[in-house]
């Protein structure tokens, strides 16, 4: 049996496209990573659908925790091992075989669920394979989520429940257990984890107030004073069967006496069934609960808080319940060693019920009350009690008689408005009505939770099919750009969806009103108002309602929402845009006269990169991620949020749009572009190249002037007269100290644009303007402690003319550009990591500009044979300017890396503002020569016409 047939047998499903399944289990396959990326979103949505349907009353945080446990790499890796999928993987890296084998052996020894992972970390390849297979199934069943779940459901068992998560030891116990096992202590799973922790901690019982008898008698009861029936406005007949649950103390426990169990019972006061009758239809919504026993384990160890009583009072105050009533139930022991047992009672008015619980035996009354309060808090936080409370509260929130908004004319008009915006008519309009009314109801939170994941999958599917050759990292960037919170909030405002919600939107907060006001003005990508969460949730909730109404059809969901979310960003859109957070950050700081600085470090534990933002040497924010550019982006976003709160600003205007503003520095002034005396004064711009990402960010510093001066005091307007510029020194700072870049590699990186004579470029024929282009050099500072003068030798980027480097000017139009020397300074605190395929990118740039292919050559080889370093150079010939650009790269251990290094420096040089100006000016000569020839031809034709006319007149005379 081959691998494909074996996987089909495990899934109990025969694939139509067996070739795709072969790709899904082959690590070196070009489709493997793409399928894994697709499958991750698919399984997340499948579990989201299941969890929301099974646990309709859980809060969003609980839903997220439950989904995270079920879609984690640890869970998926265990599924692969338990179903022997790892035997059929075609792995590329032999070292993975050992990791998979060790993990499989560890999983075989596990007896209980381990949502947080076991002792051996799961190899990611196992989880990736399961996700890849899931994507293959999803494609094979024509993108049907329901059919996928039917096939995968048995494979994904056991599905973790809220109780499974509650039974897991807290992180301190889990960490302690793993630490003990690492040093040779007993290594078992399940409840013995807590036992091991107990034994170790009890050695220090002098410093911990822990008694084994604390576990006795944990019980509470919920007493309802009258029977109740629950109503719902749902039009669909839904039947979920759950059972009555009882929490019973195990009487066989050696440390628990039978009388301790008496009356300590949690019971729901219905013997068999809890029926929920709908008020609008006769469809019964029935929950059947089977009896379950909850046994108190004597080895279960907990350390109770010192102020549990105060915390319980705070919970009651927050929920607007009466204060809890504490009382002493009994006193035990002799007078010199008394023992107290306390009880607490909580009355919840809106369900007309009472929670009552007895606590542990303690030597002091205060300790007994704190212990009791601790157990009551744990009980209130349990999923069972949350279910009971939410169900008991449902009649008042869902009772149609008490909620006239559901049938008001305002509600009907709101439903019609939303349907008109979506261009979609709901089958179940009650679903939309509930959404428009209840912001904090479980239904609203469930719709929001489902909608967010469904939209993400819809875009993932769209991008997967639209870009068949795109790598997962690029697909992820595109998906995030199209499903980000900013975009959701903008859609909610622009399309007017937020105006249709009646009860969902509370009194607008300042952030919401500011965002809506800003969106009412013309769009500005450099705003600093963060998207309010309430607006994001509204759109996600609408998406969830549509997704359920179209019967979980992802494709139909995208068809409905695509018009709202236009424009759909493409990869070209993202490449053309500067990274907005950096631009916003620098402009926000510059507006207030501040200077922004990024500093970098490593997290020793996780080995992640940390980026920190400083403003005038004062720490503002930080970001942490595996990639340094991601960490920097996170830090910039956090800094923008913090600075925008303390720096009142409505918009950050793009610097290029400041046409009508007058800026004065000294005696110079910048007048509007509509006046003739034109003197423009701008601040020096410092261009910083980031270490990892080669994106360019602009800092504006008030250090030097960039003036536009004319030869005469009066000139024509800008529309008639292209003006020359005199550019003062601009520093371009690159990263120097990088874990992947050696110090000697950055020595002597320089290039110069060489011209044998002063180049004069004719600019316009109407105005006497002369631009003189002087020689420019970008040189490493020789006084730097890491740069030796000899290192600059031969490392030259030069633009040399093959025939003539002197550009002629027109005698009647002397216009001169003067450019001063610029220094490129290497910043030792900014690391730089070169990409892997810069050589290919350089070839693409040359092809795009219709230049000949770049020529790579090995310039020198350094070091000994076992530690050899290679230096490569690259040369580009640009025919239309009759010039050649030449640059050397860094010393690298392999020829491929050396070529990529030289290509990287060439690309950065070509993208710099100075080089763009030089190439443009050099190309301008050819264009201007053509214009001059055309003008001369026109003048010649005019002369000929005049001559002909004069000849004709003479003949007539």
From Swiss-Prot:
Residues 307-382, 566-645, 837-912 form the DRBM domain. GO terms for molecular function: ribonuclease III activity; RNA binding. It comes from the Eukaryota. InterPro entries: dsRBD_dom, RNase_III_dom, RNase_III_sf. The keyword RNA-binding applies. Its EC number is 3.1.26.-. Ribonuclease that cleaves double-stranded RNA (dsRNA). This is Ribonuclease 3-like protein 3. It comes from Arabidopsis thaliana (Mouse-ear cress).
């Amino acid at each position: 049996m081959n691998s494909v047939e074996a996987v089909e047998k495990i899934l109990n499903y025969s694939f139509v496209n067996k070739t795709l399944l072969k790709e899904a289990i082959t690590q070196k396959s070009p489709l493997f990573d793409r399928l894994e990326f697709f499958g991750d979103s698919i399984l997340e949505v499948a579990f989201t659908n299941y969890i929301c349907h099974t646990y309709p009353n859980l809060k969003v945080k609980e839903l997220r925790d439950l989904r995270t446990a079920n879609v984690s790499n640890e869970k998926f890796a265990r599924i692969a091992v338990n179903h022997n999928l790892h035997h059929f993987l075609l792995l590329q890296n032999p070292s993975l075989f050992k990791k998979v084998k060790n993990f499989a052996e560890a999983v075989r020894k596990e007896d209980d669920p381990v949502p947080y992972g076991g002792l051996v970390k799961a190899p990611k390849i196992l989880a990736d394979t399961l996700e890849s297979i899931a994507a293959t199934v999803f494609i094979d069943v024509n993108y049907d989520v329901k059919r996928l779940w039917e096939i995968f459901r048995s494979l994904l068992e056991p599905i973790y429940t809220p109780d499974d998560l509650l039974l897991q030891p807290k992180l301190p116990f889990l960490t302690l257990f793993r630490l003990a096992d690492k040093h040779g202590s007993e290594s078992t799973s399940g409840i013995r984890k807590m036992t091991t922790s107990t034994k170790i901690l009890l050695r220090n019982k002098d410093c911990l107030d822990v008694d084994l008898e604390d576990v006795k008698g944990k019980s509470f009861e919920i007493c309802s004073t009258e029977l109740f029936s629950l109503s719902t406005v749902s039009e669909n007949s839904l039947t979920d069967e759950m059972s009555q649950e009882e929490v019973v103390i195990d009487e066989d426990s050696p440390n628990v006496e039978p009388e301790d169990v008496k009356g300590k019972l949690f019971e729901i006061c219905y013997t068999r069934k809890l029926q929920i009758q709908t008020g609008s239809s006769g469809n019964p919504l029935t929950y059947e609960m089977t009896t379950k026993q909850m046994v108190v384990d004597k080895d279960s160890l907990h350390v109770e808080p010192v102020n549990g009583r105060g915390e319980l009072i705070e919970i009651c105050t927050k929920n607007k319940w009466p204060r809890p009533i504490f009382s002493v139930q009994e006193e035990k022991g002799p007078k010199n060693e008394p023992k107290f047992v306390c009880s607490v009672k909580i009355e919840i008015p809106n369900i007309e019920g009472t929670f009552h619980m007895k606590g542990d035996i303690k030597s002091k009354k205060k300790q007994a009350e704190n212990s009791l309060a601790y157990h009551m808090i744990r009980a209130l936080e349990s999923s069972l009690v949350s279910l009971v409370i939410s169900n008991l509260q449902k009649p008042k929130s869902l009772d149609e008689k008490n909620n006239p908004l559901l049938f008001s004319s305002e509600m009907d008009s709101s439903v019609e408005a939303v349907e008109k915006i979506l261009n979609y008519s709901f089958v179940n309009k009650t679903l939309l009505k509930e959404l428009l009314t209840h912001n904090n109801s479980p239904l609203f939170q469930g719709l929001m939770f489902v909608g967010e994941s469904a939209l993400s999958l819809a875009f993932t599917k769209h991008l997967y099919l639209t870009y068949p050759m795109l790598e997962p990292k690029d697909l992820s960037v595109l998906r995030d750009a199209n499903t980000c919170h900013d975009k959701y909030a903008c859609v909610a405002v622009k399309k007017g969806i937020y105006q249709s919600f009646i009860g969902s939107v509370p009194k607008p907060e300042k952030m919401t009103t500011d965002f809506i006001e800003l969106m009412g003005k013309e769009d500005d990508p450099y705003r600093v108002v963060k998207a309010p969460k309430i607006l994001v949730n509204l759109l996600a909730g609408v998406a969830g309602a549509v997704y359920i109404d179209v019967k979980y059809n992802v494709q139909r969901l995208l068809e409905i929402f695509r018009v709202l979310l236009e424009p759909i960003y493409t990869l070209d859109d993202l490449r053309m845009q500067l990274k907005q957070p950096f631009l916003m950050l620098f402009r926000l700081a510059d507006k207030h006269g501040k200077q922004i600085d990024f500093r970098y470090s490593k997290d020793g534990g996780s080995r992640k990169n940390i980026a920190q933002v400083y403003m005038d040497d004062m720490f503002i924010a930080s970001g942490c991620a595996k990639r340094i550019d991601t960490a920097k982006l996170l830090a910039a976003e956090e800094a923008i949020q913090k600075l925008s709160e303390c720096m009142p600003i409505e918009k950050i205007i793009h610097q290029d749009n400041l046409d009508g503003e007058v800026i004065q520095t000294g005696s110079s002034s910048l007048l509007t572009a509509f006046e003739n005396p034109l003197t423009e004064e701008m601040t020096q711009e410092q261009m910083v190249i980031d270490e990892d990402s080669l994106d360019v960010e602009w800092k504006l510093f008030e250090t030097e002037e960039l003036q536009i001066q004319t030869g005469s005091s009066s000139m024509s307007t800008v529309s008639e007269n292209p003006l020359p510029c005199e550019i003062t020194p601009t520093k371009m700072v690159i990263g120097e100290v990088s874990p992947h870049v050696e110090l000697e590699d950055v020595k002597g990186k320089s290039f110069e644009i060489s011209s044998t004579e002063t180049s004069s470029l004719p600019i316009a024929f109407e105005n006497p303007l002369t631009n003189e282009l002087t020689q420019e050099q970008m040189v490493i500072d020789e006084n730097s402690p890491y740069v030796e003068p000899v290192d600059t030798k031969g490392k030259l980027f030069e633009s040399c003319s093959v025939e003539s480097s002197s550009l002629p000017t027109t005698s009647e139009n002397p216009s001169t550009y003067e450019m001063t020397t610029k220094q490129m300074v290497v910043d030792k605190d900014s690391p730089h990591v070169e990409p892997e395929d810069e050589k290919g990118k350089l070839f693409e740039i040359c092809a795009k500009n219709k230049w000949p292919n770049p020529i790579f050559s090995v310039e020198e080889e350094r070091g000994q044979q076992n530690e050899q370093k290679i230096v490569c150079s690259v040369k580009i010939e640009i025919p239309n300017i009759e010039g050649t650009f030449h640059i050397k790269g860094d010393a690298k251990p392999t020829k491929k890396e050396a070529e990529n290094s030289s290509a990287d420096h060439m690309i950065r040089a070509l993208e710099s503002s100075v080089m763009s100006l030089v190439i443009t000016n050099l190309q301008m000569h050819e264009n201007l020569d053509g214009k001059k020839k055309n003008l001369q031809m026109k003048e010649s034709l005019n002369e000929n016409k005049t001559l002909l006319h004069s000849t004709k007149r003479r003949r007539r005379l």
